[in-house]
């Protein structure tokens, strides 16, 4: 009979989530492997067995954040209506950030000084924008969106959603500002601004 695996994917995900919470709440100095292991109810041996080292753990956090983010964006159903699809992708972006704010900080704010993702992690991060790029290319090809370089629309759209989401998560918006309503209107205004003119 095979021995049960004690260091499984469930433990790996618990460790990643807790590590992200520690970093986003108290900064990278709060990430002690001993504290992390204790918080999750395991041993430091398990942490080293699953990740190898502290830098490898941070890289795994980065990868996991983009894996979840990419999964959510790829799950958005395409309707063929460029504006509706761009709005839906923007809403999925925000939902992903809200679901995993502790990972979002590691993905986009370089909250761990000196951390540089390895080549595979960097490739995965760049691939998460493919659903947005594909939607824009399809919108241009169908004549719905303006015939401009797709990268211009991609970066502009990404900048809008990333900026608003980052301001929201960091608490830098005025308390009376209703993010939900303004966010969707901003997404729609951006998308319609890129429509082809007759």
Regions found by a protein language model. Give the residues of each.
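Generic hydrophobic, amphipathic alpha-helix propensity
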Residues: 11-20, 36, 61-65, 69-73, ...
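Amphipathic C-terminal alpha-helical segment
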Residues: 96, 134, 138, 158-176, ...
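Amphipathic alpha-helical linker/stalk segments
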Residues: 63-88, 117-126, 141
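Amphipathic alpha-helical packing segments from all-alpha helical-bundle domains
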Residues: 116-142, 151-155, 181-184, 188, ...
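Hydrophobic alpha-helical connector segments
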Residues: 74-103, 153-157
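Short secondary-structure transition hinges
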Residues: 95-134, 173-176
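N-terminal intrinsically disordered/low-complexity leader segments
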Residues: 1-10, 198
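Helix-turn-helix
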Residues: 14, 18, 22-56, 60
């Amino acid at each position: 009979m095979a021995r049960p695996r004690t260091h499984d994917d469930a433990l790996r995900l618990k460790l990643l989530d807790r590590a992200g919470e520690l970093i986003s709440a108290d900064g990278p100095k709060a990430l002690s492997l001993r504290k992390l292991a204790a918080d999750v109810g395991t041993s430091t041996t398990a942490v080293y067995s699953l990740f190898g080292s502290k830098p490898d753990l941070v890289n795994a956090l980065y990868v996991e954040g983009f894996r979840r983010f990419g999964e959510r964006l790829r799950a958005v159903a395409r309707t063929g209506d460029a504006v509706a699809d761009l709005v839906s992708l923007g809403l999925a972006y925000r939902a992903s950030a809200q679901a995993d704010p502790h990972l979002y900080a590691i993905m986009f704010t370089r909250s761990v000084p000196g951390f540089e993702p390895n080549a595979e992690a960097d490739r995965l991060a760049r691939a998460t924008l493919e659903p947005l790029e594909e939607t824009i290319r399809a919108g241009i090809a169908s004549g719905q969106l303006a015939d401009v370089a797709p990268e211009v629309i991609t970066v502009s759209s990404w900048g809008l959603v990333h900026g608003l989401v980052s301001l929201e998560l960091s608490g830098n918006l005025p308390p009376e500002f209703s993010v939900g309503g303004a966010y969707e209107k901003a997404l729609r205004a951006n998308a319609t601004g890129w429509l082809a003119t007759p």
